[in-house]
Regions:
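Conserved coupling/switch loops of ABC nucleotide-binding domains, chiefly the family-specific signature
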Residues: 66-69, 119, 219, 251
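Helix-to-loop junction immediately C-terminal to a conserved catalytic motif
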Residues: 60
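Conserved ABC transporter NBD signature motif
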Residues: 68-76
Length: 374
C-alpha cells in the first residue's frame, strides 16, 4: 500500500508454527501457532509471564525458538538473524538515542542500510508527516512528551518500509487519557499503511480497540485466537472469560433439557437455561454433558427490575451493593439460593435506581450465558 505520506509498504503474511521456548528448564512458550494475513493487526494479550513478549522476541529474531517455525510471506525466516528479517520494532521504552535529534533517530535504520542522503531526507520527512511530527526534526527526545516520543519510535520503525511491524507494550508508558488517544492514532496509521502488525499488551481494552485478531495467552499457552468480538462474546476458556471484561462465574453441572436447550444447575441449586458453549460436549448415550462446569454471564446481560420480568431466566434477589460509576450503575445481588451476581446498567438521568437491601427481580436470556471449560 502507498501511504499518503509517500512510504510504500506491502504488508506480508506472518505465521508462527508450533513455537516453543524454555529458559533454565522452565517452559515459557509452549507450541504457539497463529497466522496473520497481510495488513492485519494481531494482539498478543495476556498477564505478566504469559509468554507474549518472548513470542514477539522470537519473531523479531532476538530469541531463538527451541522448536517451531516463523514465516513471513510464506518464507521460513526462523534461522535468519534479526538484522536480516526486515521487520520494524517499537520497544516498550522506545529506545530513542538521547544524543540524536528526532530526524537523526528516524534516519538511523536508513543509514545502517546505506541509503543515500536524498533518499534519507525524503523518507524521514514522509515518516514524520505520517506520525504528525512535522517541525520537530531538530528537537531531542528530552524535549518531547511521552506521546511524541512514541510517535518518533513508530516513525523509525516504518521508515525503511518493512512488511511487518512488531510493538512491545507500545502504549504502556503513557497515562490513561493519552493511551486511549494513541490507541486510535496507532490503529489509524496501521490501517493507512497496510502494514502487518503484531502488538503485545496486557491491556484488554487496548486489545479490543486496536485488533483484527487477538491471541490470548497465559502460562505460555495460547488459549484462544479470534476476533475481538468472538473473544469477548464467546470466550473459549474460563481464563479468557475472566481476563477479558467482567464476568459472573457460576460453578455447577450441565444437563440436557428439551431439544438443543440445556439446563445448568449451580452448586447451590440455581437452575439456568442456556445454549451451552465451548465446554458443552455431549457424552454418547448420556443425559449429562462432559467438561462444562462453569457458566459465564456478562454483567451487562443481567437485567434488573421490571426489564427482567419477561426474561426466560428470572429470579428473586436482594441488592447487596449499589455502585455509581459515572455513566454506569453496578449492582451486586444475591438470589434466594445464595448465588451472587453482578448486574451493570447505564445510569439513567432520572428513573429507577436500586438501593442496598431492596428486593428485585434479575434475569437474562439463554443466549446471554455461555458454558466454558475450566
Amino acid at each position: 500500500m502507498v501511504a499518503d505520506g509517500g512510504l510504500k509498504i506491502h504488508g506480508a503474511s506472518l505465521e508462527a508454527r508450533g513455537l516453543s521456548k524454555a529458559f533454565g528448564g522452565a517452559r515459557v512458550v509452549s507450541d504457539v501457532s497463529f497466522r496473520v494475513e497481510g495488513g492485519a493487526l494481531l494482539t498478543l494479550l495476556g498477564p505478566s509471564g504469559s509468554g507474549k513478549t518472548t513470542t514477539l522476541r522470537m519473531i523479531a529474531g532476538f530469541e531463538d525458538p527451541d522448536a517451531g517455525q516463523i514465516l513471513v510471506a510464506d518464507e521460513d525466516i526462523t534461522e535468519r538473524p534479526a538484522h536480516r528479517r526486515n521487520i520494524g520494532v517499537v520497544f516498550q521504552q522506545y529506545a530513542l538515542f538521547p544524543h540524536l535529534t528526532v530526524a537523526q533517530n528516524v534516519a538511523y535504520p536508513l543509514e545502517m542500510r546505506r541509503y543515500g542522503r536524498a533518499e534519507i531526507r525524503s523518507r524521514v520527512g514522509a515518516a514524520l508527516d505520517l506520525v504528525r511530527l512535522q517541525g520537530y526534526e531538530t528537537r531531542y527526545p528530552r524535549q518531547l512528551s511521552g506521546g511524541q516520543q512514541q510517535r518518533v519510535a513508530l516513525a523509525r520503525a516504518i521508515v525503511f518500509e518493512p512488511p511487518v511491524l512488531l510493538m512491545d507494550e507500545p502504549l504502556g508508558a503513557l497515562d490513561k487519557r493519552l493511551r486511549e488517544t494513541m490507541q486510535i492514532e496507532v490503529r489509524r496509521l496501521q490501517q493507512q499503511l497496510g502494514i502487518t502488525t503484531v502488538s503485545v499488551t496486557h491491556d484488554q481494552v487496548e486489545a479490543l480497540v486496536m485488533s483484527d485478531l487477538i491471541a490470548v495467552m497465559d502460562g505460555g499457552v495460547l488459549h484462544q485466537l479470534a476476533s475481538p468480538l468472538e473473544v469477548y462474546q464467546r470466550p473459549a476458556t474460563q481464563f479468557v472469560a475472566d481476563f477479558i471484561g467482567e464476568s459472573n462465574l457460576l460453578v455447577g453441572t450441565l444437563s440436557e433439557a428439551v431439544g438443543s436447550a440445556l439446563t445448568f444447575t449451580t452448586a447451590k441449586g440455581l437452575r439456568i437455561q442456556t445454549q451451552g458453549g465451548a465446554g458443552a460436549t455431549r457424552l454418547p448415550g448420556a443425559t449429562h454433558l462432559a467438561g462444562a462446569t462453569h457458566l459465564i454471564i456478562r454483567p451487562e446481560h443481567v437485567r434488573i427490575g421490571p426489564d427482567a420480568e419477561r426474561a426466560a431466566n428470572r429470579y428473586a434477589a436482594e441488592v447487596l451493593e449499589a455502585l455509581y460509576v459515572g455513566d454506569l450503575l453496578k449492582y451486586r445481588v444475591v438470589a434466594e439460593t445464595g448465588d451472587e451476581l453482578w448486574a451493570k446498567t447505564l445510569a439513567p438521568a432520572t428513573g429507577q435506581r436500586w438501593s442496598k437491601g431492596q428486593r428485585v427481580t434479575v434475569g437474562w436470556e439463554p443466549g446471554d450465558s455461555l458454558t466454558v471449560s475450566a
